[in-house]
């Protein structure tokens, strides 16, 4: 009986750590994707990267972010704290996806609406939200 209880406790502890680790990994991966997108956008604005390469980079960054989001959606958090962490991360990732979409639209736009500056501001805001979430999650 004690062995069964200890086994169940170990499983619950591992599962709880798993949610935290998964959220942290998703945030880190998304931060990397946003940083890459910002670099591509700045290189495009400086005339050092083609529009096609910038578009591909932004598409890849969005795919990475959506993969992280899908990973979080598959979690089954067991505690209220874990549920709140997952929900907050999903909210931030949704905002980041919107920022990436704005940046993609800016690169693809023939009439400069939205502008590259708007896309850059959206990506900077996304990076800030991810950084805040990283600090809140313990910097993992």
Regions found by a protein language model. Name each.
Residues 11-27:
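C-terminal region of N-terminal signal peptides and the immediate post-cleavage residues
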Residues 1-15:
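Sec-dependent bacterial lipoprotein signal peptides
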Residues 23-101, 105, 115-139:
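Alpha-helical segments in soluble extracytoplasmic regions
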Residues 108:
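Extended lipid/amphipathic-ligand handling interfaces
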Residues 1, 16, 136-140:
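Extracytoplasmic/periplasmic C-terminal soluble domains
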